[in-house]
């Protein structure tokens, strides 16, 4: 790290500092101050501080000779020769040296950066992530990295972090996790040897863009070792253990400031600054929507809580990708070896879509219900719910998935061609807009009255689904991570009012954690104001929930009058019987 940057950070240039080295006649006020200081018995006139450039600190009684006044301008002028194009700290001390954000008020990992770039660098280093340039791929002509851009090249952003002086050895080493099978880009199971290869390749990736080789030893996992429970990373349907979002309390460190939540009168809580290793919140107590109080004070490292949140995001991503893989196998002619190529964000491509046939459409069938059952069984703390609560969450998951998955698939492969893509890969052309079936004389277009009745029951719902859900949702331009978190959040939210008291406590805890994860995902992406983006996603829940309710009412009518021959499980789900 540049010593000039540290010098600028700890000793910013001020007029008072510069005047002490200039030949300016002292003012009467300064003489009075000097006299008062000289008359004080505690003031040592023989004190001459010295500056140790090796450690960038002032020390009394140092063996180094005191600095001379004519050497100071040379030190300051060296700021213009920053390594690898690093921005000069004297140009704009509050500007991020990575994305030029004006919110870089302090140093992060040795370089001046905003919180978003610091979070990006921390996660990249702690997870040993390597990136490929989305632009030309030429490091001499990097992509533009600016905080106002929605999509920033991660490869070029990481290089700029290194150029800004951010050092990987200052990032806390990632704790040892429970060994589980993780799907890689080729569908392989991670082994110990592969982990070593990944670590060595990551070292080569970082050292390619750094001038100094990493010589600091890696931190060994010790008493603050974090373990992820098996029920969280690889949930078992037979398991009844809830998701443990807490971490093992480590010993206190007096030198690390953080925020501690302590109980207060009533249900309110207040924050006080303490010297500990605690995070700004406890996930188990983060919700204020259910009764309870903190019985004891716990101290958790902030980085462990953040890792928990990112692992929760990865868990929901894997769960949704697994559901997409099942649909890809069920509804397309794809080959099995193509399923494991990468994370499946959308199971359908344009050439795999089929025209919608209202005559044979019957909604979810048995294999669809099995897919949703596997999907919802992976939800954290789902196994801790009561049987009736599981029934409610599963039913709501079927309804939400049917509508929201259709909106997301339409956004990915259908909106540009003005198509509504259904959950099973069927599409409906919306240009020209199809008739609803209620127009005068529309019955003459159908062979039988039964076909006309089925069409005018289904098509108005599909038209409303396209114009009131698919189009507004496409305008959000959600990422895959935002989509999977929003979907899980809506399932928990819409199920809340039918759950028992214990189920509502679990639901509130999961909702709060998902909202925190949404904010972290948006913040890491580099949005200028993550709160606004999260607010837009939360506001979309209103029209999504409205469409889910409209679909449920429509299917109730269709099953009651036998307009559509639905699966027997559909009749059972729409009955809402608890026993």
Swiss-Prot record:
DNA-binding region: 93-173
The entry's keywords: DNA-binding, Metal-binding, Nucleus, Receptor, Transcription, Transcription regulation, Zinc, Zinc-finger
Protein name per its UniProtKB record: Nuclear hormone receptor family member nhr-22
Zinc finger (NR C4-type): 96-117, 133-161
GO CC annotations, alphabetized: cytosol; nucleus
The keyword Zinc belongs to this UniProt entry's keyword annotation: yes
Stretches for region Disordered: 233-256
Annotated InterPro entries: HNF4-like_DBD, NHR-like_dom_sf, Nucl_hrmn_rcpt_lig-bd, Nuclear_hrmn_rcpt, Znf_hrmn_rcpt, Znf_NHR/GATA
SUPFAM superfamilies hit by this protein: Glucocorticoid receptor-like (DNA-binding domain) (SSF57716), Nuclear receptor ligand-binding domain (SSF48508)
Segments of skewed composition (Low complexity): 233-242
Location in or out of the cell: Nucleus
A UniProt-annotated Pfam family: Hormone_recep
Family: Belongs to the nuclear hormone receptor family.
Main location: nucleus
Keyword Disulfide bond tagged: no
């Amino acid at each position: 790290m540049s010593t000039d940057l540290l010098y600028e950070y700890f000793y910013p240039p001020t007029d008072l500092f510069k005047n002490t080295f200039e030949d300016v006649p002292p003012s009467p006020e300064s003489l009075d101050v000097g006299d008062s200081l000289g008359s004080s018995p505690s003031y040592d006139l023989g004190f001459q501080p010295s500056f140790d450039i090796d450690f960038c600190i002032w020390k009394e009684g140092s063996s180094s000779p005191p600095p001379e006044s004519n050497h100071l301008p040379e030190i300051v002028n060296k700021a213009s020769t920053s390594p690898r194009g690093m921005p000069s700290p004297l140009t704009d001390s509050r500007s991020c040296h990575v994305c030029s954000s004006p919110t870089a008020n302090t140093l992060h990992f040795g370089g001046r950066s905003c919180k978003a770039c610091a979070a990006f660098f921390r996660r990249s280093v702690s997870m040993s992530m390597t990136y490929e340039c989305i632009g030309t791929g030429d490091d001499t002509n990097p992509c533009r990295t600016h905080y106002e851009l929605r999509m920033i090249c991660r490869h070029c952003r990481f290089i700029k972090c290194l150029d800004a002086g951010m050092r990987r050895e200052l990032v806390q080493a990632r704790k040892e996790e429970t060994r589980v099978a993780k799907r890689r880009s080729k569908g392989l199971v991670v082994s110990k040897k592969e982990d070593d290869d990944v670590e060595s390749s990551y070292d080569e990736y970082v050292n390619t863009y750094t001038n100094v080789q990493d010589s600091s030893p890696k931190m060994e996992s010790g008493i603050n070792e974090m373990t992820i429970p098996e029920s969280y990373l690889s949930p078992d349907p037979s398991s009844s253990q809830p998701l443990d979002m807490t971490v093992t309390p480590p010993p206190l460190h007096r030198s690390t400031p953080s925020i501690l939540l302590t109980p207060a009168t009533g249900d309110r809580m207040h924050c006080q600054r303490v010297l500990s290793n605690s995070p700004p919140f406890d996930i188990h107590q983060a919700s204020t929507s259910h009764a309870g109080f903190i019985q004891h004070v716990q101290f958790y490292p902030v980085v462990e809580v953040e890792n928990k949140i990112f692992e929760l995001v990865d868990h929901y991503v894997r769960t949704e990708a697994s559901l997409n893989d099942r649909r890809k196998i069920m509804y397309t002619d794809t080959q099995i070896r193509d399923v494991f190529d990468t994370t499946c964000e959308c199971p359908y491509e344009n050439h795999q879509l089929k025209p919608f046939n209202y005559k044979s459409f019957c909604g979810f069938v048995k294999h669809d219900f099995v897919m949703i059952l596997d999907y919802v069984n992976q939800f954290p703390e789902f196994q801790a719910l009561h049987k009736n609560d599981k029934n409610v969450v599963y039913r709501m998951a079927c309804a939400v998935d049917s509508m929201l998955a259709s909106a997301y698939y339409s956004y990915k492969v259908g909106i540009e061609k003005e198509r509504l893509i259904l959950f099973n890969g069927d599409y409906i052309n919306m240009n020209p807009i199809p008739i609803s079936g209620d127009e005068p004389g529309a019955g003459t277009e159908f062979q039988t009255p039964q076909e006309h009745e089925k069409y005018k029951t289904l098509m108005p719902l599909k038209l409303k689904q396209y114009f009131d859900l698919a189009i507004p949702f496409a305008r959000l331009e959600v990422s895959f991570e935002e989509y999977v978190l929003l979907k899980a959040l809506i399932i928990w939210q819409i199920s809340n009012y039918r759950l028992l008291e214990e189920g509502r406590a679990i639901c509130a805890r999961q909702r709060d954690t998902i909202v925190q994860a949404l904010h972290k995902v948006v913040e890491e992406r580099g949005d200028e104001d993550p709160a606004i983006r999260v607010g837009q996603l939360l506001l979309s829940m209103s029209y999504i929930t409205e469409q889910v309710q409209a679909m449920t009412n429509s299917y109730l009518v269709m099953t009651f009058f036998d307009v559509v021959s639905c699966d027997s499980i559909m009749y059972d789900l729409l009955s809402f019987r608890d026993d």
